[in-house]
């Protein structure tokens, strides 16, 4: 593949066309530096409202604002050339009406340069999804555990582990699919349910605590790098950077206190200026 082809930005329709094909690789990112590192290796980068908890120390995603999503979304877009960038619509920015949802989504896309938005909810949000898609906004759905609803759910525990709840989530996924979502995130649901949804809906599914049968997978970058304090069951740590960072900081602190840093190679010598020769 040519370098020119490599530089082309992946689009929502291209992700939608991946149903049943090569698995879709997704991760979160909240700033340009990590986004740049991810860009060559992933298909989708989600600027998730999880940034409230990961980057800003919030207890839940509920306090996250549209302005926060735009700032982080813009940074991620700047750091990438290839991956599809999807930005979460935060709690309270799209639920009241279809018009509110469109204005928020349009603002996010225009001010960040992202290629799609994501919103949470099943049947209750299906008409909103349809309204957005009909007006040119690519929408990624999200069913199962929906963190924005934590105050009504009561916990971050897995969903769909009994027949009644599984039936509700299945109907939610069907509704979002029929409304035109180009993909659907399945978060923290029973594996057989994730497998069944993947088999039954037309858009590709992206699992996070779902099933290996999903059409793709996503994780929070900081969790898989070993930087998260509370790591869910569905996370595999591919690195353990937390202790490495702490060790590096401790070494730096020791050297500063011992005045061994900065050493000579880290400092600048004065520029020597040759004096003009004296006339004889």
Swiss-Prot record:
Keywords attached to this entry: Cytoplasm, Magnesium, Metal-binding, Pantothenate biosynthesis, Transferase
Any one GO molecular function term: magnesium ion binding
Instruction: Specify the domain of life of the species encoding this protein.
Output: Bacteria
Positions annotated to bind 3-methyl-2-oxobutanoate? 49-50, 88, 118
How does the cofactor attach, per the note? Binds 1 Mg(2+) ion per subunit.
- The gene name reads panB
Q: Does the keyword Magnesium apply?
A: yes
Protein name per UniProt: 3-methyl-2-oxobutanoate hydroxymethyltransferase
